[in-house]
């Protein structure tokens, strides 16, 4: 499926489901098998610790999205997507430095991005 999307000209590939470490979680292995160079599988950010980012040889990014992106107000994907969309090729260091400020406090109401999350 990933290679079909690339052949169709996708500029960004998003995969979700099965991003944990359970034996039957196949998405990370599928992304790796597609030929992507994995930058990170895991980030010091909650919600979203099981985020995966990779790049194909032509620079096309691929993200493995944990389930939290469907329900949480702000996640690692909210921190990474603007930079990916701007054409910035993120590195492992870009994620490791997110450890400070990487915990969403789940404030009600959510005021992200006007809060310390991801800063």
Question: Model regions: which residues?
Answer:
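Short glycine/threonine-rich loop/turn motifs
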Residues: 1-117
